[in-house]
């Protein structure tokens, strides 16, 4: 990566501004999944060990009006982070700017941490965070000593005041360890993969993945398709899909992708289906691509798993984004499990999960430690897989 990293700058005695991704699920004031906090620890600890004073910024959820602030404070995160670091984390509830915040920042000593309140509290008055208000970026930058560390891959595809805005107003904007790893794994996999390189794309909508499919058809040796978007590809070929999910306005796109794929695009050959998405009374397996009338496909079948297993044999690089079925339901998780088994058994494979539902599937089904890398950013990893430049990354200082 041709950008400066946190190891390239002198941190001792400096007030270091750090954008982290602490956008974690919180229910009744309790964090239900702290993976993103854990992922940021190496960078935070490094800054503190080097004698820096860490000033952390993060958003939590969406905040559009005053009422949305309820339940969106980073207070539970501050407490969780303090426990993980084994030291106090300064935090002022509800405060994202002003004299009280400035006094707290200026009272920091070497090796101490302050977490600023949810950056999206600034969105209540004119979306200042989300629209990258220049005055806000300049103000937040003024709290530090000219060094900004971006370690929030999950928001790197957004141009916000707390990443791009601060970057524009500091002497050095550098990557943290998490951001560096994310870019190294995902970009390297797409731009310079060890071959054979197989991409697996699932999820419900073709529309979400058009750019990714187009880019990966150029870069990968094979692209396997599963999940709900399978049925848009099926219908584009005139195959009966029953009541399965379909994007009627994307049938031409699906057809065009199939035509230009030169056989690289591999689709399922059977389905596990039900007579309703949620309150179903009948589940059955259908041999062949067609789905029976009155039913909808909710997972790939055993022949598809075997076909994908064969396609993955010998793969040295695998990028997976999107489950094969409704994995949250035990009736429809066999496809996702089968594909994970097929990936992780390949000797010497570099296996990367592109965040989102795939990451949730690997974690919930006990496969997380079997993959080389699980991305912390769904949207950001999708844009990297699409070949796009990420604003948060572009704003960093060149080496």
From Swiss-Prot:
UniProt: ATP binding residues: 209, 297, 328, 355-358
InterPro entries: Phosphoglycerate_kinase, Phosphoglycerate_kinase_CS, Phosphoglycerate_kinase_N, Phosphoglycerate_kinase_sf
Chain positions recorded as substrate binding sites: 21-23, 36, 59-62, 120, 158
Gene Ontology biological process: gluconeogenesis; glycolytic process
Catalytic activity: (2R)-3-phosphoglycerate + ATP = (2R)-3-phospho-glyceroyl phosphate + ADP
Gene Ontology cellular-component terms listed: cytosol
Principal location listed in the UniProt entry: cytoplasm
Documented EC number(s): 2.7.2.3
Record-level Gene Ontology MF annotations: ADP binding; ATP binding; phosphoglycerate kinase activity
Family note: Belongs to the phosphoglycerate kinase family.
Protein name, per record: Phosphoglycerate kinase
Species whose genome carries this gene: Streptococcus thermophilus (strain ATCC BAA-250 / LMG 18311)
Higher taxonomy: Bacteria, Bacillati, Bacillota, Bacilli, Lactobacillales
Gene (UniProt): pgk
């Amino acid at each position: 990566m041709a950008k400066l990293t946190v190891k390239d700058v002198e941190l001792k005695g400096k007030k270091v501004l750090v954008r982290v991704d602490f956008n974690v699920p919180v229910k009744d004031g309790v964090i239900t999944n702290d993976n993103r906090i854990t992922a940021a620890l190496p960078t935070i600890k490094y800054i503190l060990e080097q004698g820096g004073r860490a000033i952390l910024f993060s958003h939590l959820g969406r905040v559009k009006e005053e009422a949305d602030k309820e339940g969106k404070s980073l207070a539970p995160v501050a407490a969780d982070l303090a426990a993980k670091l084994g030291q106090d984390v300064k935090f002022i509830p509800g405060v994202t700017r002003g004299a009280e915040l400035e006094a707290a920042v200026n009272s920091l000593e070497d090796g101490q941490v302050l977490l600023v309140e949810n950056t999206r509290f600034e969105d209540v008055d004119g979306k200042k965070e989300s629209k990258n208000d220049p005055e806000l970026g300049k103000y937040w930058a003024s709290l530090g000593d000219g060094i900004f560390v971006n370690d929030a891959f999950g928001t790197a595809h957004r141009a916000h005041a707390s990443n791009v805005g601060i970057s524009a107003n500091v002497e050095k904007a550098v990557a943290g360890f998490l951001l560096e790893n994310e870019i190294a794994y995902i970009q390297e996999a797409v731009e310079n993969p060890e071959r054979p390189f197989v991409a697996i794309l699932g999820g419900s909508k073709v529309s979400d993945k058009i750019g990714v499919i187009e880019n990966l058809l150029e870069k990968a040796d094979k692209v396997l398709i599963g999940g709900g978007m399978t049925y848009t590809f099926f219908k584009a070929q005139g195959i009966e899909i029953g009541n399965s999910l379909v994007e009627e306005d994307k049938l031409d796109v699906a057809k065009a992708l199939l035509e230009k794929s030169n056989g690289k695009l591999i689709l399922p050959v059977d389905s596990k289906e039900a007579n309703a998405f949620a309150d179903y009374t009948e589940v059955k397996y259908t041999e062949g691509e067609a789905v029976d009338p009155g039913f909808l496909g909710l997972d790939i079948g055993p022949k598809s798993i075997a076909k994908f297993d064969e396609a993955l044999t010998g793969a040295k690089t695998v990028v997976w984004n999107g489950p094969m079925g409704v994995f949250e339901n035990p009736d429809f998780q066999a496809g996702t499990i089968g594909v994970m088994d097929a990936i992780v058994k390949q000797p010497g494979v570099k296996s990367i999960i592109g965040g989102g539902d795939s990451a949730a599937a690997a974690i919930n089904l006990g496969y997380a430690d079997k993959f080389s890398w699980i991305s912390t950013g769904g949207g950001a990893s999708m844009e990297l897989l699409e070949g796009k430049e990420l604003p948060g990354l572009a704003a960093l200082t060149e080496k």
